[in-house]
Every structure is written in C-alpha cells, then in structure tokens.
C-alpha cells in the first residue's frame, strides 16, 4: 500500500467490528482475492464508500495493485453519480449490492466489483487517488493524488502524532473524505488497529464500542466537537483515550480551549490541525503543548512541509508578524492537480509541490500561523469589504449559534437562537452596517455534509 509493507504487521489486529476481528494477515489475504481478478494494467475504479470493512479491503487491494481509486459517497444522489460516471468512464465500480449484476466479476461479502468500461483508459502512471473537492454536490472537479503524495503525508502525520502499533482508532469520518482516509492510511502504515463502525458519535452504540475495544484515538471536525459538548463528553469515563485530533474547518476557539483544558487535565494529547484535500490531507498542526496559549492558531507546518504568507497584490513573501496575506504551502504531499474530465487524468503535476491555499492568514512572533478568513468568503456591502468568517467567529464568541453567508450588498446570518433583533443590533453597532443590508433568519438545523462541513451554498438558499 503506497510502498508500505503491510506483511510486516501480519499478526497485529487490523480491523475490528462488533461481529469480526481481522488481523493484518486476514486483510492481506482478502485483498489479494480482489487484486487477482483485476487486470495488471492500471485501471480507474470508482468506490461507493460506506463505513465498513468491505470498503477498506477493496481500497487496500486497489492501492496494492497500483490502480487509481475514485472515492465517492455511497449516498450520493443518483443523477449526480451518473454525471461523474459519464464524465470519467471508470473501468470498474465497487459497491454494496444485494444481487449480482451481469457485469459483476467478483463479490466480496455483500460488495460487487462491476466491470463498467472495458476500454483502455490512459492514466498518469503515478495517479492513485481521486477525491471530490465539493463534498456531496457531485461536481466533476476532482483532486488527483499520487502514491508519493499519500506516502509523504502519511509519513509526516505519523511523525508528529507519534502513531504506533499500540494505537487503536475508531471511525468517525467517511472514507471519501481526505481527513477520513488519512486516518486510515496513518494507522495502517504503523500496524495499528481500527475499530470500524457506522455509528454516529451521538449514538450510545458508538461509545459502547469505544469503551469495549479500548480506543486510544478520536478524530473529528468542528461539528463532532460541538456534538461532544451536547452529549456531555466531559463527564464520560474514557481511560483508554490518549489522543484527540481536530481538522476539517476552524473550531470555535472557546470550544477548542475547553477541550484543550480537559485534555491537559486527563493526560490526553489534543491536536488542532489544518489541511486541504489538495495537500492530500494535512498541512499544519498545533503541537498539543500550545493548544491552550495558542488556541486560535493552526500551528506550524507538518514535518517536511513549509508554510509562507504572500502579499495578495505583489506576491512577495511577508516575513513580519501579524501582517495578513495569502497562505502558501510547499511539500511532497501537494496534489498532481485538478481534473474535470477523463483526459485530465493523463496530466502530470504542474504545481511543483506548491499550493496556493486561498486562505488569508498571518503568523505571530513565535512563527505560529493563524487563519483569518477565505479569499472567497468576502462580500461588499455598500462598497465595504466584509469578511464573513470574521463576523461568524465574532458572533460565536458572543455565544450565538450562527453561520454567515451573503452576496453583494446583503449580509445573511442564520441562527439557531431566537434573539434575532439582538444579533442585528450587535452587527450594526460593531460593523457600522445599515439595518437594510442585514438579513437574519432562524434555522433549526444547519446544513452539513456527511463529513461535518457546513454547506454554505445550501444555507444561502434559505434566504431566497
């Protein structure tokens, strides 16, 4: 698997469910069954991913056989899925299926490997993984990643998290999501164990498995941590827990500090991290020793990576502290490039290991980096440039449950609270905005993707 020899961990426990336990030897044996029915020439294989052992086995088999894997959400709308299939014309589709399709060439448990296209597809020899840039929208735009990208990011993450064969993680993030895949990669690479469950963190069954199998590591996006507070996580007795990580968006710094303080008190290492699919997964991390005094920071570059800030207009590197610019990243984990068509899968990298993140950032006097917003998360209200992330974070710091979006001349605030006039007055007083430029709407449930990221485009529709 991307040049990591899983055979060295043959006797280690690899995958655990409520019904089964697979050693690494079992996983290798199962994956070889799939490898043997696939052609030797590199194939494009679409995975309709679910949180189960079958998805993991199929994925490992395809990587070991040097094929290209397109990871998609199994619950993706059929019309959107059809668009992707028509665009990329994959050789095979691997999915959960109750009955054999006439084109099924192999079944592993209740999954079918279906031959979809027998034509030869010209693929970049280094292409290993395709991930969507758009969550569940079904856009054909994909991030393309090489084995070298996967290996580099895996090595960096295992180094700073100090993952070992003694670790045991539980699935919380989908496998079509770069963060979820990185958790899988890093633990397999070290011969660690993975408890595989489809249960949500708000489910009693999830925590029953967590305790029964003595899970050491928890990973989550901001949504997960907000849910943990609601289910009274701080009152739980979890003696096996040693490491917690957070990525997938900015965690409210008040919540981050609460978890940092709890973690310190319970001898748990809590890592706040930052990444993008375009960099395979991880770009920066906040060392756990600083998660209290620098709770708002994304930290420092991952091992073997480099962060810099460039002036938006001149593109010159900004060396001084607290001066805002666009964040750039350099490292071997930077993608091959984007693909929007089958022809794009032949492309070789033109990025030279450099990623323009699209995030506004600054660094402090100690060299720790802070995200201040998105270049595209700005609106102009009566000629005034408004940072939507800044306003959202400001309102959250005042205790309001809000999300912000907008367009030209209108700031839109969705809230789960009832005090709409109070929020409007605060915005008028703080940002000198006219009341006619602000729309505030009560929404019971914020729209999120399966990986817990906010669907701002859908949020905006609520104001139409």
Which ranges hold each PLM region?
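Conserved AMP-binding/adenylate-forming core of the ANL superfamily
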Residues: 11-39, 82, 145-148
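Conserved AMP-binding/adenylate-forming
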Residues: 20, 33-75, 172, 385
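Conserved AMP-binding A3 loop
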Residues: 23-24, 127-155
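AMP-binding/adenylate-forming catalytic core of the ANL superfamily
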Residues: 47, 331, 337, 358-435, ...
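Conserved pre-ATP/AMP-binding loop-to-beta segment of ANL
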Residues: 115-132, 139, 162-168
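Conserved AMP-binding/adenylation subdomain of ANL enzymes
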Residues: 151-168, 178-217, 302-304
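Conserved ATP/PPi-binding loop(s) of AMP-dependent carboxylate-activating enzymes
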Residues: 300-304, 315-348, 386
């Amino acid at each position: 698997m991307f040049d990591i020899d899983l055979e060295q961990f043959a006797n280690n426990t690899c995958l655990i469910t409520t019904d089964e336990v697979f050693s690494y030897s079992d996983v290798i044996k199962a994956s070889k069954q799939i490898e043997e029915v696939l052609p030797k020439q590199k194939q494009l294989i679409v995975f309709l991913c679910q949180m189960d052992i079958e998805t993991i086995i199929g994925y490992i088999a395809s990587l070991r056989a040097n094929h290209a894997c397109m990871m998609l959400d199994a619950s993706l709308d059929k019309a959107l899925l059809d668009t992707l299939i028509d665009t990329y014309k994959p050789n095979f589709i691997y999915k959960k299926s109750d009955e054999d399709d006439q084109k099924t060439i192999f079944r592993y448990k209740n999954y079918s490997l279906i031959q979809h296209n027998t034509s030869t597809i010209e693929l970049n020899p280094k292409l290993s993984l395709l991930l969507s840039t758009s969550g569940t929208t079904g856009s054909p735009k994909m991030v393309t990643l090489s084995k070298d990208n996967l290996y580099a990011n895996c090595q960096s993450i295992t180094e700073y998290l100090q993952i070992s064969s003694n670790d045991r993680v539980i699935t919380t993030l989908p496998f079509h999501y770069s963060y979820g895949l990185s958790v899988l990669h890093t633990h397999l690479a070290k011969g660690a164990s993975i408890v595989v469950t489809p249960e949500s963190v708000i489910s009693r069954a999830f925590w029953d498995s967590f305790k029964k199998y003595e899970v050491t590591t928890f990973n989550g996006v901001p949504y997960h941590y907000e849910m943990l507070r609601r289910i009274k996580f701080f009152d739980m007795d979890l003696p096996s827990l040693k490491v917690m990580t957070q990525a997938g968006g900015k965690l409210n710094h008040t919540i981050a500090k609460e978890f940092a303080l709890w973690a310190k008190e319970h001898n748990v290492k809590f890592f706040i991290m930052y990444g993008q699919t375009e960099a395979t997964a991880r770009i920066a991390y906040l060392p756990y020793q600083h998660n209290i005094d620098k709770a708002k920071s994304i930290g420092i570059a991952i091992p073997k990576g480099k962060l810099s800030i460039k002036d938006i207009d001149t593109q010159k590197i900004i060396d001084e502290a607290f001066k805002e610019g666009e964040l750039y990243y350099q490292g071997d984990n930077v993608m091959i490039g984007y693909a929007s068509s089958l022809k794009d899968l032949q492309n070789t990298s033109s990025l030279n290991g450099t990623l323009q993140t699209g995030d506004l950032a600054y660094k402090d006097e100690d060299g720790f980096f802070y995200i201040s917003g998105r270049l595209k998360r700005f609106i102009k209200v009566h000629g005034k440039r408004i940072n939507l992330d800044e306003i959202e974070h400001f309102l959250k710091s005042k205790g309001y449950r809000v999300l912000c979006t907008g367009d030209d001349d209108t700031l839109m605030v969705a809230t789960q609270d009832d005090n709409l006039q109070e929020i409007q007055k605060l915005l008028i007083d703080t940002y000198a905005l006219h009341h006619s430029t602000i729309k505030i709407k009560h929404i019971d449930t914020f729209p999120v993707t399966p990986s817990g990221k906010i669907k701002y485009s859908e949020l905006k529709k609520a104001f139409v």
